């Protein structure tokens, strides 16, 4: 293999690696967007659950049962 052929082969590999890095970067960005969206939804659902729990649970004093 001549020096020119080796250089061409290396340039091809670098180009393929750059393409792979760009694709992985895009996928990672999309996944972070999804994680952020899911995190916001989870926080909203948690807050809603706590609100409903407060509305549903009567204020019962914590006392020992009579048989204690």
Curated annotation (Swiss-Prot):
A Pfam family per the record: SlyX
InterPro entries, sorted: SlyX (IPR007236)
Cystine pairings recorded for this chain: none
Gene3D superfamilies, sorted: 1.20.5.300
PANTHER family for this protein: PROTEIN SLYX
Family affiliation: Belongs to the SlyX family.
UniProt-recorded name of the protein: Protein SlyX homolog
Protein source organism: Brucella melitensis biotype 1 (strain ATCC 23456 / CCUG 17765 / NCTC 10094 / 16M)
